[in-house]
Amino acid sequence: MATAATEEPFPFHGLLPKKETGASSFLCRYPEYDGRGVLIAVLDTGVDPGAPGMQVTTDGKPKIIDIIDTTGSGDVNTATEVEPKDGEITGLSGRVLKIPANWTNPSGKYHIGIKNGYDFYPKALKERIQKERKEKIWDPIHRVALAEACRKQEEFDIANNGSSQANKLIKEELQSQVELLNSFEKKYSDPGPVYDCLVWHDGETWRACVDSNENGDLGKSTVLRNYKEAQEYGSFGTAEMLNYSVNIYDDGNLLSIVTSGGAHGTHVASIAAGHFPEEPERNGVAPGAQILSIKIGDTRLSTMETGTGLIRAMIEVINHKCDLVNYSYGEATHWPNSGRICEVINEAVWKHNTIYVSSAGNNGPCLSTVGCPGGTTSSVIGVGAYVSPDMMVAEYSLREKLPANQYTWSSRGPSADGALGVSISAPGGAIASVPNWTLRGTQLMNGTSMSSPNACGGIALVLSGLKANNVDYTVHSVRRALENTAIKADNIEVFAQGHGIIQVDKAYDYLIQNTSFANRLGFTVTVGNNRGIYLRDPVQVAAPSDHGVGIEPVFPENTENSEKISFQLHLALTSNSSWVQCPSHLELMNQCRHINIRVDPRGLREGLHYTEVCGYDIASPNAGPLFRVPITAVIAAKVNESSHYDLAFTDVHFKPGQIRRHFVEVPEGATWAEVTVCSCSSEVSAKFVLHAVQLVKQRAYRSHEFYKFCSLPEKGTLIEAFPVLGGKAIEFCIARWWASLSDVNIDYTISFHGIVCTAPQLNIHASEGINRFDVQSSLKYEDLAPCITLKSWVQTLRPVNAKTRPLGSRDVLPNNRQLYEMVLTYSFHQPKSGEVTPSCPLLCELLYESEFDSQLWIIFDQNKRQMGSGDAYPHQYSLKLEKGDYTIRLQIRHEQISDLDRLKDLPFIVSHRLSNTLSLDIHENHSLALLGKKKSSSLTLPPKYNQPFFVTSLPDDKIPKGAGPGCYLAGSLTLSKTELGKKADVIPVHYYLIPPPTKTKNGSKDKEKDSEKEKDLKEEFTEALRDLKIQWMTKLDSTDIYNELKETYPAYLPLYVARLHQLDAEKERMKRLNEIVDAANAVISHIDQTALAVYIAMKTDPRPDAATIKNDMDKQKSTLVDALCRKGCALADHLLHAQPHDGAAAGDAEAKEEEGESTLESLSETYWETTKWTDLFDTKVLTFAYKHALVNKMYGRGLKFATKLVEEKPTKENWKNCIQLMKLLGWTHCASFTENWLPIMYPPDYCVF
């Protein structure tokens, strides 16, 4: 057996499938039509130029002609210009950069910038490098440092049992070192590499250098030109293996560092056009084709596509005159075939004859799950994913060869507007090249992301042959050839495979044989605002319906007017279904002609029905249809009270990959459904997909979608629940996973439930006190247990600034149509550490369908450090923020300034997640709610019965800090008592806040005692004059005023406090340290410390004016602590900055030494006195405690206080103090990592979009 297995040849042809599409046979017939002369734009995560198979074409040309990042994720602001001094430049990182002597720079000026490597490293690479850096750079050194600190602490504890003040400090010092090292380990965070970037003009072209070694020795770094000039690229190191190229824009003011954002793009490019001269069996479909790599997946957004990236990409596609675009991306869209991005795609296709191939989506098996643009845009060829038996063996190592099938997850049509959705299918899996940074040569990936480049490569072969033979083609003729020659698989439905599996050789023959003018045209089919007839809801199929269909020819861009005039086409219209009636003929000229189609679905059985009305040129009927009108009808099953609103199926047989669809008319009043699946097989565990979709106009399918991938064990049971909309048809799909082996039998039931609330969203205003909502059990007996949970508070922001400007050279559409940006700036305060979700309500959830080019927000802290970013789908971009002030910058782009100006006051919201959820009390009648008595628990509601509920307001002390008027709390209302019902039937709740109650302060100054005598005006004047003099004393720096006031008011404490603050705040403070000490002593001497200590020791104060006394005592304590700290800081500064005098007399030296000892003794006394009154980590005391530690050379204690100072005031100077102490302690690894954080935490400006 083993011998037979090893002798069987390895199925190389199944690793990257070409046989199934006819690509292999085509290349056997025409080996030179291997993609030569064809340029494919790969719009993806970027292509690694160093990956296997990405170097040359079959005819020796560069495989990748250019590499462009259109997202802006690799952009570096290099607007700062500097000139070297002595051959050196100080980079924005603070490193000294040595300019090599052999660099040519006639102007002598360099543009400099800075970039954190983790800003553009792919996520997987970043995680790997972080792990490796910790293991190699941090852990070994840190373990030694921690062990040494623990050893010292233990030795001290053994040797010293005394509790003297000196020993106490030493013990604290050693303990601090251990605590700090443990804390650094817990808080370890790798800033990643920080690269200085230089750009200059050498007299002929722009050049760039990235200090990839981070040591300033630029002679060892790679100098690069724009990639398209010489196909140059560099690498960030042997550990990273991350290849990069550059592009320089705006006269050197902007550098784009281009890296791959993920492995996806390289894999896609390898499928389409990889070439291995030594291993041709590993070649992609079109090894002779060239590639234009365009990165549209923004690394900042986990490689999500953005409007900015896509529109810039289409500009590049047009400028490079690309023949093909492969786009293995897409999202669900609320309305198909519309939006700014789709308009630009249409322009590239219709006007510039670029064939746009895209993935249909990976959201099957339900119908109408095609993504945008692949399955929803008329100009785009959407490709479904097919899996062949050879692929199953070679790629997936299945034990058995199963019949060819569509992958379970491949998206299905039709589009929501009736278009077929999927155009063609191709193999949806491959083992192909991936970037070097993955440390793999190849990888298995599957998806319509893989079927699209397989089809795209096949089309490249066709175009290569057409170009070699000078055969004209258009996007319309090529698409028609693909669709009319594709092979339909009998066991795969039309909505999955489209017109069938692409056949390269047959499509080529078709185009060679059919060269008529009519075949070069496109035809737009419209049914009102739709592109097909799609009857899905019960009301649409209840009676026959007539549909007006418009058919209009689309001419290639450069068609002569004479050809348009002479155009006359005689068409035969056919339909192969009896339930559709259409005209038999149509005469078409250069205008839109309308026909009427009648659809009568009344006699159709339950389920799905599809047909087409096809238009044939009577002159060449064998060429296949010139256009098709797709018609889909869904006949839904009904459930009623007699069946308890259940739909049951028993002992249902499933083969591998088999799909069963059930269309059900959801009963009016149903709000959720429960599906129960039970296995009847005792020997086979099975993988199933449960999928349900309801379609609502102008809502993406994902808005009302349920999806669950599950493993069903032998004789096992699974129960799931999902929300439904009453009165509309729902598709419930249960599918056996495509790779499952053996057959299996199951029972399953779909059961509908309904608890209807009066409002689809509950809006509660706190001022109303009590809010009512009513509930009805609409179908059957239901157990109720209403519960309102609030999980976040939402803050609304208005822009503090709005700026509009024209964008750069990358943002000019054909015919010099300039794009503009508006940048809106918002500010908000984060009251405490927590998770936030920023979003722009007007624009969010819109991407391809948006009328604006893009939306991108970036959030910054008060030091302009980038904290996070997001775009169209806010739920994907939650982030954690510490307490502090933050700025949000939102970029919106459009071609028209007037449209941007309308948004200059655009609101923005920040949703703050509550650390603990809040609940609102719910009562069953108004009286109980009014009195705050018995709350509702649970009850059983019979069918059609109503029950009112009353919600009371949230107590004021529960309102989260920072929330106030203009904010609201967001959460949900659940009504069902069952866990499944709670999970599925959820009603949104908004609780709108009002101003907090006014609180009267204790010890109010307005409260006068009866015994207190009013001050006369003269006394008031004298006091006011005194206070005015004190105020001006600090401004004028006048000692005379102080002396005068001291004589007049010798016991007035605020005078001495003001004098102390005045001296301590002076510019020449260091020269007046002794005066500060004297001033502090004066303040201290005027406070009765005994009385203060006695007051603090009191447990309660029974006196009637206790609040006033407390206020006075608190002020005295604060003043005392402040004076002690200022005195201590002055004494410490005196010791820290004392300089020895060379050549000083012996007597002077002795005097200095005695003075120093006296000062040190005074400092120690002040320190211990301070500890009597307050904690050393009090904000006021931290600076003194820090300086006291420095004087005593206790750097562990100093660092402990310094880190606390950073937490209170995270300035660059405070961080530098920490770094200095780390170095003094010998913790160079901690210092190094912290130093690397500084340019990230304190960037010179906001990062560019």
Curated annotation (Swiss-Prot):
Residues 1003-1018 have a biased composition (Basic and acidic residues). Keywords: Acetylation, Aminopeptidase, Cytoplasm, Hydrolase, Nucleus, Phosphoprotein, Protease, Serine protease. The modification Phosphoserine is found at S915. PROSITE patterns: SUBTILASE, SUBTILASE_HIS, SUBTILASE_SER. The active site is at D44, H264, S449. It is an enzyme of class 3 (hydrolase). Its main location: cytoplasm. GO terms for molecular function: aminopeptidase activity; identical protein binding; peptide binding; serine-type endopeptidase activity; tripeptidyl-peptidase activity. The modification N-acetylalanine is found at A2. One of its GO terms (biological process) is protein catabolic process. Residues 998-1018 are annotated as: Disordered. Signal peptide: none annotated. It is found in: Cytoplasm; Nucleus. Its EC number is 3.4.14.10. InterPro entries: Peptidase_S8/S53_dom, Peptidase_S8/S53_dom_sf, Peptidase_S8_His-AS, Peptidase_S8_Ser-AS, Peptidase_S8_subtilisin-like, Peptidase_S8_subtilisin-rel, TPP_II_domain, TPPII_C_art. It catalyses: Release of an N-terminal tripeptide from a polypeptide. Residues 9-508 form the Peptidase S8 domain. Belongs to the peptidase S8 family. The limitation of proteolytic products to tripeptides is achieved by tailoring the size of the substrate-binding cleft: the two negatively charged residues Glu-305 and Glu-331 that are blocking position P4 limit the number of residues that can be accommodated in the binding cleft and thus create a molecular ruler. At the same time, they orient substrates so that the tripeptides are removed exclusively from the N-terminus. Cytosolic tripeptidyl-peptidase that releases N-terminal tripeptides from polypeptides and is a component of the proteolytic cascade acting downstream of the 26S proteasome in the ubiquitin-proteasome pathway. It plays an important role in intracellular amino acid homeostasis. Stimulates adipogenesis. This is Tripeptidyl-peptidase 2.
